[in-house]
């Protein structure tokens, strides 16, 4: 499993510049992905804590929704067409917000994002319901906007690879497993229990529903270190601290409580409402442009506006309905 992840990451790093590919790496064991620390492709330092993993998945869902809004604005269907369109316009890729976090501006090129989770079992034990819900949302919708998941586990039980996750992750790889039951859990059929080990695998994808037997490549640790050392010499990573800084409270196998604070007390909340009322539309990208704030802050203000009845709920690519006609209605309670 770990060798396969190293092979996959090295292949991606060889073929993609940091401006084209960003990585979020989750390593509960703290040692498997240590060689990749501080490479320029990382959006955040390698994550080892469950709380930060849930925060990163939550951020990825928000980023997915933001990207769909940008695709709708440009009237394109996927990230490839979007990037071709913005490159033809010659627009910049990103800027830094007031906190120094790198933000992709509206009209800027979108890098692909790959989230790699080295061991799913640890996460599912701590926050199964929320991890499952976030993974399913990303797996269902995020491919068109360039966000991809790589999930790995040494324990392929139904508690870890749930039916919902299986239904939304069509591409699967099985190495040697202990029993026929484990093979069925991964591939929906037996066979992986007969593999020989040392990279011998069965692969199943949406376009290849019948598993195909493949020999995996072997990447040695010193080869990984040479690649990552070279990348670190080229440039430093530009971390986005918002990815892992969202407050999260883990409640075992139950829910995760996201405490965003009272955005009604945000010093820009009233200014944001004024922008929405004047423009008669509401979106995070609009607040980013008009107020020059980061994406996460704009998204939280939009959520608070919806909770207070200032704007209507999201409706696909349609703009949100503005439900008040004046900022004064905030004070009057109308």
Would you name each region that the model predicts?
Residues 11, 19-21, 62-334:
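P-loop NTPase motor-domain active sites and their immediate coupling elements
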């Amino acid at each position: 499993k770990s060798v396969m992840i190293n092979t996959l990451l090295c292949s991606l790093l060889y073929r993609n510049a940091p401006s084209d590919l960003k990585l979020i790496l989750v390593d509960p064991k703290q040692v498997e992905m240590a060689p990749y620390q501080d490479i320029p492709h990382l959006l955040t330092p390698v994550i080892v804590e469950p709380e930060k993993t849930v925060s990163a998945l939550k951020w990825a869902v928000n980023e997915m929704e933001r990207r769909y809004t940008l695709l709708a604005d440009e009237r394109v269907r996927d990230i490839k067409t979007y990037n071709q369109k913005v490159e033809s316009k010659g627009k910049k890729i990103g800027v830094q917000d007031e906190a120094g976090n790198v933000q992709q501006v509206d009209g800027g090129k979108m890098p692909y994002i790959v989230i790699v989770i080295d061991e799913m079992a640890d996460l599912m034990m701590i926050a199964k319901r929320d991890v499952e819900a976030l993974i399913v949302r990303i797996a269902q919708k995020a491919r068109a906007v360039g966000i991809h998941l790589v999930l790995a586990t040494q324990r392929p039980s139904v508690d870890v690879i749930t039916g919902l996750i299986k239904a939304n992750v069509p591409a699967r790889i099985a190495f040697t497993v202990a029993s026929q039951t484990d093979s069925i859990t991964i591939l929906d059929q037996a066979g992986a229990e007969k593999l020989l080990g040392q990279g011998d695998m069965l692969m199943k994808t949406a376009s290849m529903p019948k598993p195909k037997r493949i020999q995996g490549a072997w990447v040695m640790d010193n080869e990984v270190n040479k690649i990552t050392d070279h990348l670190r010499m080229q440039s430093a990573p530009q971390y986005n601290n918002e990815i892992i800084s969202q407050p999260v409270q883990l409640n075992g196998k139950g829910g995760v409580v996201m405490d965003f604070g009272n955005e009604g007390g945000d010093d820009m909340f009233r200014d944001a409402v004024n922008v929405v009322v004047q423009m008669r539309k509401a979106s995070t990208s609009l607040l980013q442009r008009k107020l020059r704030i980061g994406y996460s802050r704009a998204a939280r203000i939009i959520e608070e506006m919806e909770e207070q009845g200032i704007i209507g709920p999201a409706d696909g690519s349609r703009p949100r309905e503005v439900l008040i006609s004046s900022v004064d209605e905030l004070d009057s309670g109308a």
